[in-house]
Amino acid sequence: IVGREVGNHYLPTRKSPIHTWHEENNAVFVAAGLWQRPRYYPRGSEDMNSAVNREAANVRKNVGICDVTTLGKIDIKGPDAPEFLNRVYTNAWLKLPVGKARYGVMLREDGMVFDDGTTSRLSENHFHMTTTTAQAANVLSHLEYYLQVVWPDLDVNVLSTTEQWSGI
């Protein structure tokens, strides 16, 4: 209707609950999807390489934390949840003990890596999956597709909880 007379577009930005802390500590941010994620923390006139090397040396000698709020988070529940994870990941999930987590790689149908992340077993049929920031929405769609079209007989529910959880 308006053609090229649309004006400025609104681009939503997601920030972690500790975004202000990152700003106060001079973080240089990078866009990660809709998220603003800290890339490094320069001191004075440090360039990125110097700041990253300083941070890495400090973590090796002391301790470090990382704001992982931007990672995708998916809640997976149902009696067939372990079997479902067995089918969508390259590694086994049936015997993962409750209270433990496992790193997993998810492939596309052509065998190329689609996404990776950790999945924790919260109870016998309840899992918490993390995805990469960039692929969070695509992984959720991928899981929903397989549950609705490929394996409709599996009794599993998936729900994005990305906006309900923060992580450090």
Map each language-model feature to its residues.
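Glycine/proline-enriched, intrinsically flexible loops and inter-domain linkers
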Residues: 1-168
